[in-house]
């Protein structure tokens, strides 16, 4: 089943709605120029609140798959290793999503806990970036299923010459499908409740990422759109 990441979470209420809807990953943006930036102190409280709520629910309702603990992902743009490491520990995050000009060595420093966002203009550029940033220890056939269930190799977003995300552009799905046949990718780029099922059918990605497509306003989620997005994404049957 396709993984779903709700990004740009800024408050506990939105986080809990996303988790209750069946979201697999929650994303927190630690890039201050972003209108969805959230301070580490706030994220720490959100993560703690989600953990407490999920623990309480799973104690009451055994084996309820709609209330499993999501992965908590920190989104960074050209931050230092020290800054990222401190925030990871302080906020108790599971993974790092890197959106800037980080080097392959920088990505590999996190030993499988990080994945790189790429915004290629063409399939040729995508292939070049993939070879540059391919994880140092890709899954072998024996552990591929397990590894693919944890994190994607890349997040594929729409190209923009200056923006690091939230471009308002739709990613080239034909290019994305070519990449998704070879590597587990997270598809981003103007996904909404109305187009995510079509995108999954066309691309067959490891997962899908949404932020503005489920917002009431920048930094605040529309709860009904969150539920509709997750339902639409999870409703696509995968071979």
Question: What kind of feature is each model-predicted range?
Answer:
Residues 1-138, 148-239:
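Conserved N-terminal beta1-alpha1 strand-loop-helix module at the mouth
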């Amino acid at each position: 089943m396709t993984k779903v990441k709700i990004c740009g979470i800024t408050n506990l209420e939105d986080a809990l709605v996303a988790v209750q809807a069946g979201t697999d990953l929650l994303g927190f943006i630690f890039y201050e120029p972003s209108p969805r930036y959230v301070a580490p102190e706030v994220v720490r409280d959100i993560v703690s609140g989600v953990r407490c709520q999920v623990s309480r629910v799973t104690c009451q309702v055994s084996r309820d798959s709609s209330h499993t603990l999501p992965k908590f992902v920190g989104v960074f743009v050209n931050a230092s290793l020290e800054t990222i490491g401190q925030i990871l520990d302080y906020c108790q995050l599971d993974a790092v999503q890197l959106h800037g000009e980080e080097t392959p060595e920088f990505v590999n420093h996190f030993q499988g806990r990080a994945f790189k966002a790429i915004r290629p203009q063409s399939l040729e550029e995508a292939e070049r970036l993939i070879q540059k940033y391919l994880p140092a220890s890709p899954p072998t056939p024996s552990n591929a299923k397990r590894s693919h269930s944890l994190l994607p190799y890349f997040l594929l977003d729409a190209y923009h010459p200056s923006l690091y995300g939230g471009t308002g552009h739709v990613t080239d799905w034909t290019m994305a499908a070519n990449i998704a046949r070879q590597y587990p990718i997270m598809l981003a780029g103007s996904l909404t409740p109305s187009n995510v099922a079509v995108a999954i059918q066309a691309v067959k990605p490891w997962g899908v990422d949404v932020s503005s497509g489920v917002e009431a306003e920048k930094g605040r989620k529309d709860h009904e759109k969150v539920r509709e997005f997750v339902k639409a994404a999870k409703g696509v049957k995968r071979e």
